[in-house]
Amino acid sequence: KTTGLSTGMKQNGAITVASTKERMQELLRQATTAQLSDVEVEVLNKKRLKELYPVLHSEDIVGGVYMPKDAQADPVGVTNVLAKAAKMEGAKIFEKTPVKKILTKNSRIIGVETDKGIINCEYVVMATGMWSRQLGEEINVSVPLYPNEHFYIITEPIKNLPQNLPVLRDYNAC
């Protein structure tokens, strides 16, 4: 449902680069799979990479793929918008209320037991991050989520850096 609330989403696309022939072969397989699902993908040579990402040091890059419709959003902004939209529809949000147990009946969630008592409900949003998988196991629900470490850098503004650069991924550099 459209709420008119902004998530801060920016659709700048995404580039994944390959610095080995093996990684490039993997990217080509992934691009083919994406195209079978009607996802727009462009296979990139070094020249096209520099056009799309002019600040990229591309001497040791074999090639890459570009997905122009990929987007990014601020996770905190998305969380706040989802919470506000849910409240607009009558949902109640309980912060700082640890759940001890998810209550079920006939394979359906009927509520949660917290340290403040039982909360009966028709729906539960498990916003428990990396603990969601463990919580799901307790009620025989598979949550295909695994902890994964990500790296990013924070810098001062970089002069003349285009503001609409695609997200850049280099799995060989991590």
Q: How should each PLM-predicted stretch be described?
A:
Residues 14-18, 64-66, 152:
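Short aromatic/hydrophobic contact patches that present stacked aromatics
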Residues 30, 55-56, 138-139:
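Residue-level signal for well-ordered alpha-helical positions
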